A protein has these predicted regions:
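TRNA-recognition modules of translation machinery and tRNA-sensing kinases, especially anticodon-binding
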Residues: 1-126
């Protein structure tokens, strides 16, 4: 269905995954972080400002949109979160900005063959 390195979470796996996410988000919220659930893909020009350009073809999934728009699936919620303030000038008194992002992340993990170590399996969506 999803090909190599795709998976389903089922039953208690779903419950455990959601419990861990909820615990983490609750912890961050109590520490004063603003919770953010960003979009799963962003425009190419924004992605170019938030990641290393070498990541584009090697690690990121491209999404074909309108004729004039290219989008990329996010590899981390930090990419769209950092872009939220891309045209702002921040005053020192307004810092630090503290965000807790929750999202699925998407990476090709190209060349990841043989890199599964210590029980961690590289997958395309996590």
């Amino acid at each position: 269905m999803a090909g190599h390195r795709g998976y389903f979470l089922k039953g208690v796996g779903v419950l455990l995954n959601n419990a861990l996410i909820n615990f983490g988000m609750s912890f961050l919220h109590k520490k004063g972080y603003d919770l953010v659930q960003p979009p799963f893909f962003i425009r190419k020009e924004i992605m170019a400002e938030t990641c290393q350009l070498s990541d584009f073809h090697e690690n990121l999934y491209k999404v074909e949109g309108d004729e004039n728009e290219e989008y990329y699936m996010i590899a981390t919620s930090e990419q769209p979160i950092s872009a939220m303030h891309r045209h702002e000038w921040m005053e020192e008194k307004d810092l630090p900005k503290k965000y807790g992002g929750i999202s699925s992340c998407f990476r090709k993990e190209a060349g990841a063959h043989g890199k599964d170590t210590w029980g961690i399996f590289r997958v395309h969506q996590f």
